[in-house]
Amino acid sequence: MKISVTGATGFVGKALVADLLSKACEVNALVRQSSSELPLSVTQLVVGDLALDDSFSFLREVFSGVEVVVHTAARVHMMNDDSSVPLTEFRKVNRDVTLVLARLASELGVKRFVFLSSIKVNGEITRASHPFTPDD
């Protein structure tokens, strides 16, 4: 099976890539910066920043011919966020880019798009007595 993974050097992404490779999957790894953390056996390594390249043209090659896209790339909480408008940046990367990726995957005939969200998806408070609903 041929799978593209965004955020392939992130906390979840690199574990996922290792697991997929151990199962003999072909993996296209999309990373923001080149890194030695990825195994050499990935099928394709593509360096690109989803937050900066609004054309997403480089993704056509990454998504072409794959059966599954697993989107793990995200802007996660950082204690020293240097953005002047962090909420806007979170929404751009975690919401807007995700929508573009899902649409592109659909356009290219990708059979499955798997989205792993970030820890902040439901806000700041998790109450054990109140499960999250679609309205939260």
Where are these regions (language model features)?
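N-terminal Rossmann NAD(P)H-binding glycine-rich loop of SDR-like oxidoreductase domains
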Residues: M1-K23
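SDR active-site strand-loop-helix element
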Residues: T6, L30, V69-R75, F113-I119
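Catalytic loop of short-chain dehydrogenase/reductase
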Residues: H130-D136
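Conserved glycine-rich Rossmann-like NAD(P)H-binding loop of the short-chain dehydrogenase/reductase
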Residues: C25-Q33
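NAD(P)H-binding glycine-rich loop region in Rossmannoid oxidoreductase-like domains
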Residues: S36-P39, T43, V47-D96, V100, ...
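Phosphate-coordinating loops and pocket residues in cytosolic domains that bind phosphorylated ligands
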Residues: K92, F115, P134
